[in-house]
């Protein structure tokens, strides 16, 4: 069915196709049965939470938490919804989502379009969970005090989420990445940490970082008591691309991001000295790529664009491949493979 659906979905506008996919997953989540088995070798504990497996859905796929159960049914060990802002916002003008099919990539300039925290949180609270639920929060584009928006989002999401992610990595909200350095970063992390209560707090940062910025983020996150770093998001860089849409503005995700994302994972592993769990995201579309990131230091991995090209069977395939690869290398548990190269 997935191979039949893809040509139909690829024949229409990317954002319309995404909306239809969310509708289908939302419906299937209410009646469907899980597609993927959960090998007993794959649980991973991060920040006191035991994830059934290390594979998570990255934020951006289910912005408003409409298909949480459906995504869990595909086999994900974690589903991260959002980015959610305190107030609803429309985001940037359409078209704003572009497939780069020859490159197995996507460019987006969505701009934190979402229905707001108040609409999404009741759905998140009611959703059936078979793994860890992350809620990714951000600031409204026109907020007078963006740090206050994060503070509000963390406080609102913390009682419902298994973990909350502060997203300061998006390139599509002007000035947002300025929160990744200097006094603004220190203030943001301190206020967010005070607002989260006992709920684990993750920080999502961009892959477009210089060495000094990486060191600064690592020090600030450790000092503030952040529980994990998600490295990273889409990139504003443009490696060699062959698609007609390659010149569109926005953040690039998918296969061309893999090299940069893997390097940033190694950079943050060095900068944190192993003091913080790392979540790898960017260009992960196979069990081999997920396993390579885990061996390079990631406790968890996430994907989104991989689903666009790999379809709904991809999470289950990655889970099976992880189990095979770790056993091939003599590991009894996937946790034993973390950071072994």
What are the residue ranges of the model-derived segments?
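Catalytic cores of alpha/beta
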Residues: 64-73, 151, 209-223, 270-274, ...
């Amino acid at each position: 069915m997935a191979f039949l659906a893809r040509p139909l979905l690829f024949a229409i506008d990317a954002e319309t196709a995404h909306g239809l996919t969310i509708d289908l997953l939302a419906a299937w989540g209410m009646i469907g049965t899980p597609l993927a088995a959960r090998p007993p070798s794959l649980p991973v504990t991060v920040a006191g939470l035991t994830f059934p497996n290390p594979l998570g859905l990255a934020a951006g796929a289910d912005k408003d938490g409409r298909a949480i159960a459906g995504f869990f049914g595909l086999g994900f060990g974690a589903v991260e919804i959002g980015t959610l802002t305190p107030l609803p916002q429309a985001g940037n003008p359409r078209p704003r989502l572009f497939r780069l099919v020859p490159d197995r990539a996507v460019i987006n300039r969505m701009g934190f379009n979402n229905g707001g925290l108040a609409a999404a949180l009741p759905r998140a609270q009611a959703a059936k969970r078979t793994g860890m639920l992350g809620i990714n929060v951000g600031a409204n584009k026109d907020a007078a005090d963006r740090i206050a928006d994060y503070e509000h989002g963390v406080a609102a999401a913390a009682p419902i989420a298994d973990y909350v992610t502060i997203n300061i990595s998006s390139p599509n909200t002007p000035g947002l990445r300025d929160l990744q350095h200097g006094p603004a970063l220190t203030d943001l992390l301190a206020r967010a940490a005070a607002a989260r209560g006992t709920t684990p707090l993750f920080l999502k940062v961009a892959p477009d970082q210089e060495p000094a910025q990486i060191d600064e983020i690592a020090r600030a996150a450790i000092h503030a008591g952040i529980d994990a770093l998600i490295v990273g998001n889409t990139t504003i860089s443009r490696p060699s691309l062959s698609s007609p849409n390659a010149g569109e503005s926005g953040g690039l995700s998918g296969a061309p991001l893999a090299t940069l994302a893997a390097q940033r994972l190694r950079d943050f592993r060095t900068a944190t000295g192993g003091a913080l769990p790392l979540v790898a995201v960017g260009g992960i579309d196979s069990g081999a790529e997920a396993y390579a990131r885990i061996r390079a230091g990631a406790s968890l991995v996430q994907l989104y664009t991989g689903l666009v090209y790999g379809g709904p069977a991809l999470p289950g395939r990655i889970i099976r491949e992880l189990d095979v690869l770790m056993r091939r290398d003599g590991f009894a548990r996937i946790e034993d493979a973390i950071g072994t190269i």
